[in-house]
Design a protein with these regions (language model features):
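Short alpha-helical "recognition helix" segments of helix-turn-helix
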Residues: 26-35
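DNA-binding alpha-helical recognition surfaces that contact promoter or target DNA
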Residues: 10, 14, 42, 46, ...
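Surface-exposed polar/charged interaction patches
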Residues: 18-22, 50, 68, 72, ...
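Acidic, low-complexity, intrinsically disordered interaction modules
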Residues: 42-45, 59, 65-69
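Short, basic-rich loop-to-helix N-cap that marks the start of a DNA-contacting helix
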Residues: 50-64
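A short, Lys/Arg-rich alpha-helix, primarily the initiator
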Residues: 1-25
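Recognition helix of helix-turn-helix/homeodomain-like DNA-binding domains
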Residues: 36-54
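Short, charged recognition helix plus adjacent turn
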Residues: 2, 73-101
Length: 101
């Protein structure tokens, strides 16, 4: 199985390095309110559960980090992050298909 948390974490580190800002602690409230990277409520509900929970934190960090990037790099990082989040949500949905959430 692909380690989405690792992929997302590496992407975040690369983006942070690029804009030279440091990682900060983020609360789950901030995650739920600020995660503009995630495109839909259903994706949020999938990612909010299980092993992919950390991806929401990464999404919010990415959202903050990319505000400091030039527009062409912002698009690149947001698209890459969105791809990872969608794959993780799909994997989580498959895993939980027979469970009541």
């Amino acid at each position: 199985m692909v380690n989405y948390n690792f992929q997302a974490g590496k992407l975040i580190k690369d983006a942070i390095r690029e804009v030279n800002v440091s990682h900060r602690s983020i609360s789950m409230t901030e995650v739920l309110i600020g995660s503009g990277v995630v495109g839909s409520d259903s994706a949020l509900s999938w990612i909010r559960n299980g092993e992919t929970k950390d991806l929401m934190r990464y999404a919010v960090v990415m959202n903050e980090v990319t505000k400091k990037l030039p527009s062409n790099r912002l698009v690149y990082y947001r698209l890459k992050m969105f791809d990872i989040l969608v794959m993780a949500a799909e994997a989580q949905a498959q895993k939980g298909r027979h469970n009541k959430w």
